[in-house]
């Protein structure tokens, strides 16, 4: 099998762990490639490098890091339909499993085709600005104020039906995957990964009656940002772009999925309890 490994800023103890993982993969007869990004901080002249242009040959890609690395990996893969195995050596790693747990076992399971392939939906932004070459996000697309403490004013429509006008610091359009991220921090609910929904969550709304709305993921969201004298940001996961003046955007579910490799015994609610202390109560 052919596997690529992507990572960002791998130093110290992480280098030792990565060296051990590469040695294990080679021992199990994998052909291993490193991303150009990873080679900036982890250089091994014996291992070939890959770029976004030649990843279609891979059986899967290992995202070695935390959730930020996995989002970076998703950006590089895009529509290429390559499976991702998230290996957490970062802080939280909600979308990855901890490297210290079961790496060798899951590699054996992958060779035996004994794993679960979890399809995660994404959201896309239209129109595509000339400065935006990748208009999709696994977690969320957010519109956020930038240069001022003043609020921004966003008119929101779902399937051409007017919802309301948000006076706020911004607005988050989240997938089920992203429901445990930025949206959750802003008071949004948690959706299970297989949910066929999107979330609209305001950021610090001036109207206390405004809360998250759950809509079907077949819906098309139109946002009209009123003209103002300050810049604002449109962020897609970790990538941000600056806009000014009145703008109109369409946000909808992407026409492709991301495929995450999970152990057969993967339990979403166990992950919530373990990594977010969900339901933790000193009385239990």
Please tell me what each predicted stretch does.
Residues 1-60, 72, 100-116, 126-135:
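ATP/NTP phosphate-donor binding region
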Residues 10, 67-69, 90-92, 177-179:
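Short glycine-rich anion-binding loops that position phosphate/pyrophosphate groups of nucleotides
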Residues 63-67, 75-76:
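N-terminal glycine-rich "phosphate-gripper" loop used for MgATP/nucleotide binding
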Residues 30, 79-82:
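A short helix->loop->beta-strand "cap" motif at the edges of active sites that frequently abuts
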Residues 14-15, 69-73, 180-185:
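Short glycine/serine/threonine-rich phosphate/pyrophosphate-binding segments
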Residues 135, 143, 148, 159-162, ...:
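ATP/nucleoside-binding phosphotransfer catalytic cores, i.e., glycine-rich phosphate-binding loops
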Residues 165-168, 173-209:
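Gly/Ser/Thr-rich active-site loops/lids in small-molecule metabolic enzymes
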Residues 90-169:
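Catalytic core of DAGKc-family lipid kinases
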């Amino acid at each position: 099998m052919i596997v690529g490994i992507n990572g960002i800023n791998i130093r110290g103890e992480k280098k030792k762990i990565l060296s051990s993982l590469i040695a294990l993969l080679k021992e199990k007869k994998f052909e291993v490639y490193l991303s150009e990004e990873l080679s900036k901080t982890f250089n091994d002249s014996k291992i070939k490098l890959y770029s976004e242009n030649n990843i279609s040959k891979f059986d899967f890609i290992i995202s070695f890091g935390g959730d930020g690395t996995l989002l970076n990996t998703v950006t590089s893969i895009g529509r290429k339909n390559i499976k991702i195995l998230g290996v957490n050596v970062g802080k939280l790693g909600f979308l990855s499993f901890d490297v210290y747990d079961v790496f060798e076992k899951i590699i054996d399971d992958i060779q035996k085709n004994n794993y679960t392939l979890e399809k995660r939906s994404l959201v896309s932004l239209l129109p595509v600005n000339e400065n935006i070459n990748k208009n999709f996000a696994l977690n969320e697309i957010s519109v956020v104020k930038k240069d001022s403490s003043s609020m921004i004013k966003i008119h929101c429509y779902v399937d051409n039906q007017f919802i309301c006008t948000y006076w706020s610091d911004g607005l988050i359009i989240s997938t089920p995957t992203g429901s445990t991220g930025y949206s959750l921090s802003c008071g949004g609910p948690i959706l299970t990964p297989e949910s066929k929904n999107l979330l609209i969550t305001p950021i610090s709304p001036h109207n206390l009656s405004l809360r998250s709305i759950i809509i079907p993921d077949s819906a098309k969201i139109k946002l009209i940002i009123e003209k103002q004298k300050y810049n604002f940001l449109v962020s897609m996961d970790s990538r941000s772009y600056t806009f000014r003046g009145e703008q109109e955007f369409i946000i909808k579910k992407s026409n492709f999925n991301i495929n995450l490799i999970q152990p057969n015994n993967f339990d979403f609610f166990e992950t919530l309890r373990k990594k977010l202390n969900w339901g933790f109560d000193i009385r239990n």
